[in-house]
Amino acid sequence: VCGRQLPHKDANPLAVHARNFNYSSKSIVKSKADIEKFGIKTVFMSNSFAAYRRSVFEELSGFPEHTILAEDMFMAAKMIQAGYKVAYCAEAVVRHSHNYTPREEFQRYFDTGVFHACSPWIQRDFGGAGGEGFRFVKSEIQFLLKNAPFWIPRALLTTFAKFLGYKLGKHWQSLPLSTCRYFSMYKSYWNNIQYSSSKEIK
């Protein structure tokens, strides 16, 4: 189960919209039966504010030993596959947000692309993120038009940075290791990486 995250008081308009978009005021419980309806959002989870039933966590071997990020999504996906349910509790609230620069968003989405490249079974079983990404951009522009129109150029630049970072991350094995480390937000991840066409974390 994960709770609701609200933006910090000093959050910029992009950070405010991101939290409003991803963390609604309505609680929900999702299971394998919801995959067709929610797609990859079925396994949305955030370790910034989450708890796992220990018995189930240990039954499914816990978090993967070597993943660049999104171990929370990984575990939620394993739980759904095993027939368990995951919950979002909107009544449990914390403040958590980041005022990322376009460069930092590029790095974060590069790492997200690496994660999906190394765990392709998640998108294979739950669907891709393209549709959700388009819905996010549309919602963001509408939010900014109403609340902070001068931030729209920054939003467009950030969207391009995310897209480029994600696409490069999905094809990280075609890049020099030094380039991957430079593009990545989590530099230490690359210390023990070896190239492999079959490298998949499951």
Which ranges hold each PLM region?
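Conserved donor NDP-sugar-binding/catalytic core segment of glycosyltransferases
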Residues: 1-17
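A short, conserved alpha-helix in the catalytic core of glycosyltransferases
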Residues: 50-52, 56-61, 66-93
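Non-catalytic, C-terminal membrane-associated alpha-helical segments of glycosyltransferases
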Residues: 111-114, 118, 122-202
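Short, hinge-like loop/turn segments at secondary-structure boundaries
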Residues: 16-22, 104-107
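Active-site donor/metal-binding and catalytic loop motifs
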Residues: 82-106, 115-120
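A recurrent flexible, glycine/aromatic-enriched loop bordering the glycosyltransferase active site
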Residues: 31-55, 67-68, 74, 116, ...
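Short, flexible active-site-adjacent loop segments at beta-strand->alpha-helix junctions, enriched
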Residues: 4-7, 27-29, 48-49, 92
